[in-house]
Amino acid sequence: MAFITINHHAPADNGAAFVAENATLAGSVRLEKNSSVWYGAVLRADTGRIAIGENSNVQDNAVLHTGPGLDVTVGSGTSVGHGAVVHGCTVGDGCLIGMHATILNGAVIGDGCLIAAGALVPENMQVPAGSLVIGVPGKVVRPVSAAQAAAIKANEEEYLELARAHAEAK
């Protein structure tokens, strides 16, 4: 893993369960307890801060990047899917950001949301808690169903187990 200090700001690991050896964390990045950062992911905080909450996972090849004056905050129990781009925005607790979804500057994703694979959340969009967002540009189409909420929680739990297994395999 590459932990890179930028302008005297170094990544901080506060008990992450797993950080892949080819993940890159640059600048003011903070990983909380039991979080995980997977293969090929890039967390680049050269113009702001990135915070990854407890039990959250940033999956393979995802990119998280700050913007000038724009931090990235990912709440607890949230999954950022493979190849997602999360830029200068806030993602609440218990969310699932689908594979190859993009969330742009200033967007705020409420707790318990599902952002569908490939969706584009435009700049400054405010997504109410418990919403399902689909499309390009992304639109709130309905509340997250009970089955989808259970799947979000199951994904969090699966990645906690996978993180432990991968950490032990080193």
What is each PLM-predicted segment?
Residues A2-N14, L70-V72, S76-V85, D93, ...:
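C-terminal segments of enzyme domains that contribute to small-molecule binding surfaces
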Residues I50:
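A short, polar/charged loop-to-alpha-helix boundary motif
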Residues G15, A20-E21, A26-G27, E32-K33, ...:
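Left-handed beta-helix
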